[in-house]
Amino acid sequence: MLRLDKFKKYPLTFGATPIEHLPRLTAALGGKVQIYAKRDDCNSGLAMGGNKLRKLEYIVPDAIESNADTLVSIGGVQSNHTRMVAATAAKIGMKCVVVQESWVPHEDAVYDRVGNILMTRLMGADSRIVPDGFDIGIRKSWEDAIQSVKDAGGKPYGIPAGASVHKFGGLGYVGFAEEVRAQEAEMGIKFDYIIVCVVTGSTQAGMIVGFAADGRADRVIGIDASGTPEQTRTQVRQIVDNTAELVELGRKVRDDEIVILEDYAYPAYGVPSAETNEAIRLAARTEAMITDPVYEGKSMQGMIDLVKKGYFPEGSKVLYAHLGGAPAINGYSYTYRNG
């Protein structure tokens, strides 16, 4: 049994998220593989929720115990993560500084004024747009923001991009795996594959550790959306090892149990391809399930392509992890102006 119980958890979500069968999407893809979705996009009342809240539930107790008064984080201009950090800060009564780097080579008249960044500002966060480009690692702009809070007499608590390389960043998605196992028992089924978008890495890494407990680590199929897959793979490996030790998995996860597919991130991080847009429209028009062009649209594209290519054996049950992110689609208003 994985030892998640050792760690304090601050409630930011409604609890277990629903799993739903997607019959019209299943039929549209030929009906030979059954598609389900785990709706982590519907996990909270905090500013439209999303996957980062699972991670932050295990990080907030540490932030509170540190006597911090300001959460400091980083992401792109349309970062879901910085929205969730801003929401968490508002909920627990802390100040918030978020650095918004220029990660996406995307031009839209309203890109920096709608969606995630709009809500981030609305919740009172100090949102600082900087020109630095995309990188999932530890960033100088973030370190500078932490120092600026100190210089102003504040007590910062740093949360890296995606909450991923934080010491507790992988715990929330170990919990996801435990939750899925309980739901499988209730539903009387077992999922053969789990599809998840991967960029900064801790969502997939936590799932890998969680599903390693029942031998399904290599059934967690990461769809890279970073466009820098080797950096992502290295970061996932590090988070897997750290998280496995924290929860006492009792063995090292093998390299061949970390599955990341690199075929769908093109043309660049945050820039949807024609195939991404087709996937977004198909999910919307068959199941009214909204996915975004940065993350979930690309993992949806990957899943659709894998089904069509016969990657999954006939009769497989595939669980699509919907991590949230729909607010970002507002920053692509011209792309989707006609649907």
UniProtKB/Swiss-Prot annotation:
The protein's annotated catalytic reaction(s) are: 1-aminocyclopropane-1-carboxylate + H2O = 2-oxobutanoate + NH4(+)
Any single GO BP term = amine catabolic process
Which residues are annotated as active site?
S79
The record's keywords, sorted A to Z, are: Hydrolase, Pyridoxal phosphate
A GO molecular function annotation here is:
1-aminocyclopropane-1-carboxylate deaminase activity
**Its domain of life?**
Bacteria
Q: Which Gene3D superfamilies match?
A: 3.40.50.1100
Modified residues annotated as N6-(pyridoxal phosphate)lysine in this record: K52
Q: Which Pfam families match?
A: PALP
Disulfide bridges in this chain: none
Q: What is its EC number?
A: 3.5.99.7
Kindly list the cofactors needed: pyridoxal 5'-phosphate
Quaternary organization: Homotrimer.
Question: So what family is this one in?
Answer: Belongs to the ACC deaminase/D-cysteine desulfhydrase family.
Biological function: Catalyzes a cyclopropane ring-opening reaction, the irreversible conversion of 1-aminocyclopropane-1-carboxylate (ACC) to ammonia and alpha-ketobutyrate. Allows growth on ACC as a nitrogen source.
Query: What is the designated name of this protein?
Result: 1-aminocyclopropane-1-carboxylate deaminase
